[in-house]
Amino acid sequence: MKKKVLAMVLVMGMAAGVLTGCGTAKDVSADNGKYAIGISQFAEHGSLDNCREGFIEGLKEEGLEEGKNLEIKVSNADADTATAAQIADNFVSEDMDLICAIATPSAQAAYNSAVNTEIPVVYTAVTNPEEAELATEDKMPVGAVTGTSDQLPVEAQLQMIRKLLPKAKTIGILYTTSEANSAYSIKQYEKYAEDYGFTIETAGVTNTSEVSLAAAGLLEKVDCLTNLTDNTVVSALPTILSQAEEAKIPVF
């Protein structure tokens, strides 16, 4: 019951990025005990770091603060799906009151590990919850899991690229083959690219060590690159930007 009540307090404010509007920890912590929350972050980069810090700040605003009535355990998968699964399994075995999963692979792993338990999962930075099987087709939560999406405005991106590069023909996309969020985004680019006079060229990687070579090959074939919410690729973004600058290929 404690887990369910905590989840109700937290998820109501997720869309706004802070935890508001459903009472405070003082209202729900009838046993005056501490809550234990596990944060599973898929990779180390700025946008996901901001998600983590924003979540912790939101907890504090709701009256849940480390060292007082809250214990937080943060684990980073270093962009490895097997590690994300292990982290999720560990949180479940430790009987956390709630798991916060940051990015699609970590969210999928947390859901799969916690599905037959009473541990709720709150996710963020998930591009398409339906495609990741974290929500139904009508956008309803699946089990005790809910969260927010960071889906890209693909058509707006294509419009901008066409406006800035009127002669461009081919857009390159680097992506991680195991990230469902990237597969979905590529489908969206391929769906709309022809409407704006583009073709899409992709290069897949399985880890950050492959990014440099994949980027070098892709840069020879395209007029520009566009970036996805791909955690492995974003982790290697400084390398990609350096290569693109040398090749005089713009990156969006």
Enumerate the language-model features and the residues they cover.
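Beta-alpha junction/loop-to-helix N-cap segments that form part of ligand/metal-binding clefts
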Residues: 77-136, 230-245, 249-252
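Pocket-lining segment of extracytoplasmic ligand-binding domains
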Residues: 174, 180-249
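An alpha-beta-alpha
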Residues: 37, 55, 146-193
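Stable alpha-helical elements in mature extracytoplasmic
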Residues: 47, 51-58, 83-87, 102-106, ...
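Short, low-complexity disordered leader/linker segments with a strong preference
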Residues: 1-36, 61, 65
